[in-house]
């Protein structure tokens, strides 16, 4: 079976994957469900996967010459208890074969990833049955953030509280598999809707369509700086708040519930108003004293033109477009897929 799989998947032959891993496992780590829809235009192919990635008990072990092997770890017990991974049937052999054919026959493959690719890492998505929207959560909009100091205070208080847990997430099997395929030359370009930087930590360098929570930007002068520095400034301005948050036992779900906490896809945490409403202070811009926000595209905002143009360019030039972990419900992603279909 091992030699047969090597012949069938020549681009996954050693040294790209160790003999301890079967070839179907590699492709299964990329699948986000058991149902595929394939759309054909006159010149292009687009393949969707529905559902969400399920964590593999037997992890893919992929290596590329000159690239260190990164160990992937299962989600923590706490994150498993939160049930952020939607239920999905395992991919069939037919599913794996469909994905193999798409990758094998393409020379300019573009991959678009969404929140579903990070659920097994402990970061929930929005639209699955267990996603953020299922509990009535409504993410902050750009308009709310800009016009309301109260909304900004609520956002930053929750985001500060959720930062330690959010940044503790590790890349999953799919992140690692995509990074290895990218470095092996099988993926021409990667675009992600996610703001969690898990692709980067796995070794990829995708275009971050919606930005990243790892940077903070001034709405007035455009100055940007590292989020960790912002966290330190919040701590200095709110020592009692910071001490209360840091004293929580993150391995004990009960202690989180005492603060009314629940992790969200964009890195913040749902938390009772009484814990942030009074006396929470937000840092201002170092250069102009302006309003700071995470360098992400909130709902109601537009993707920066340069970024959007780059995404459209690679979509226009690709010969195959693979969507993983996304329902393509946001306009920025929908436009890319629609753009491919109409060509």
Name what the model sees in each region.
Residues 2-343:
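Conserved catalytic core of sirtuin-type NAD+-dependent deacylases
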